[in-house]
């Protein structure tokens, strides 16, 4: 995970002071890209402990099309509580856009089902894209999408693998990236999604490419970032998915595990709401 530490170091060294919606203040850089070979291990930050149950549960919640925090809370996951209303609702956020994008004629598009079908039927298509950035719905969202759009790419088998399956890669564009708290979650979440989609489409995994727009450290995360930068990365863990799961909607928390995760201790930091 040296790529993540390089990002952290870049923001500390080159970030410019900027105000922000929360009033906290940030150091910010614009435009950064990281690439992770998913065959080399599961890209889970090791220089601090990441709460994997929250990462995995949040992704499953998105894939359910859910926009109420109750499902998360029932599983001990509270990462969205600060933005929910009294009924636990968040408005038409990620899950709604992924699974039920509204059309002008009153229909809804299940982008996730559509992209899985496209990967199976037309792997060479350049339209394997899912977007959460629905301009018309943003005013009704508790929080505008930070990770806005992702695209899958199917590469043919490499040299010596002519008879094997292709490799599935994913690129995420993230318009707003909380480098200390959010980005480690985002990397692991989309790496997991790539593994899951690869499994249900009969492919191997390739790369996860993470492209960031405004990559920032909040002013009250700077000491924590500097502490993290003193730590040496440890070997990446291995992701284990239950091989009996053949449809994306069938995945549950019990089907997802990591082996060999040996991180440095966690580093607490306040979340900017």
From Swiss-Prot:
It catalyses: dUMP + (6R)-5,10-methylene-5,6,7,8-tetrahydrofolate = 7,8-dihydrofolate + dTMP. Pathway: Pyrimidine metabolism; dTTP biosynthesis. It comes from Nocardioides sp. (strain ATCC BAA-499 / JS614). This is Thymidylate synthase. GO terms for biological process: dTMP biosynthetic process; dTTP biosynthetic process; methylation. Homodimer. One of its GO terms (molecular function) is thymidylate synthase activity. Its EC number is 2.1.1.45. GO terms for cellular component: cytosol. The gene is thyA. Belongs to the thymidylate synthase family. Bacterial-type ThyA subfamily. DUMP binds at residues 21, 126-127, 175-178, 186, 216-218. InterPro entries: Thymidate_synth/dCMP_Mease, Thymidate_synth/dCMP_Mease_dom, Thymidate_synth/dCMP_Mease_sf, Thymidylate_synthase, Thymidylate_synthase_AS. Keywords: Cytoplasm, Methyltransferase, Nucleotide biosynthesis, Transferase. The keyword Coiled coil does not apply. HAMAP family: Thymidy_synth_bact. (6R)-5,10-methylene-5,6,7,8-tetrahydrofolate binds at residues 51, 178, 272. It is found in: Cytoplasm. PANTHER family: THYMIDYLATE SYNTHASE, THYMIDYLATE SYNTHASE 1. It comes from the Bacteria. CDD domains: TS_Pyrimidine_HMase. The active site is at 146 (nucleophile). The keyword Protease does not apply. Catalyzes the reductive methylation of 2'-deoxyuridine-5'-monophosphate (dUMP) to 2'-deoxythymidine-5'-monophosphate (dTMP) while utilizing 5,10-methylenetetrahydrofolate (mTHF) as the methyl donor and reductant in the reaction, yielding dihydrofolate (DHF) as a by-product. This enzymatic reaction provides an intracellular de novo source of dTMP, an essential precursor for DNA biosynthesis.
């Amino acid at each position: 995970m040296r790529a993540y530490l390089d990002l952290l170091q870049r923001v500390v060294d080159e970030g410019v002071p900027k105000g922000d919606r929360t009033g906290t203040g940030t150091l910010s850089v614009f435009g950064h890209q990281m690439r992770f070979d998913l065959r080399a291990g599961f890209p889970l930050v090791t220089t601090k402990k990441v709460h994997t149950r929250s990462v995995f549960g949040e992704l499953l919640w998105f894939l359910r099309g859910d926009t109420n925090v109750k499902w998360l809370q029932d599983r001990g996951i509270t990462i969205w509580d600060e933005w929910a209303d009294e009924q636990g609702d968040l408005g038409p956020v990620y899950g709604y856009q992924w699974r039920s994008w509204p059309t002008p004629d009153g229909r809804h598009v299940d982008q996730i089902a559509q992209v899985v079908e496209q990967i199976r039927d037309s792997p060479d298509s350049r339209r394997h894209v899912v977007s959460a950035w629905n301009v018309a719905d943003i005013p009704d969202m508790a929080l505008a999408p930070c990770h806005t759009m992702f695209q899958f790419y199917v590469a043919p088998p490499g040299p010596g693998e002519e008879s094997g399956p292709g490799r599935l890669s994913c690129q995420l564009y993230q318009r707003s990236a909380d480098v200390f708290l959010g980005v480690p979650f985002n990397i692991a979440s989309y790496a997991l999604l790539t593994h899951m989609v690869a499994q249900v489409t009969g492919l191997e995994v390739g790369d996860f490419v993470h492209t960031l727009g405004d990559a920032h450290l909040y002013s009250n995360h700077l000491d924590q970032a500097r502490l993290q930068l003193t730590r040496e990365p440890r070997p990446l863990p291995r992701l284990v998915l239950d091989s009996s799961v053949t449809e994306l909607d069938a995945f549950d928390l019990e089907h997802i595990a990591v082996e060999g995760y040996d991180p440095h201790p966690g580093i607490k930091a306040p979340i900017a709401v």
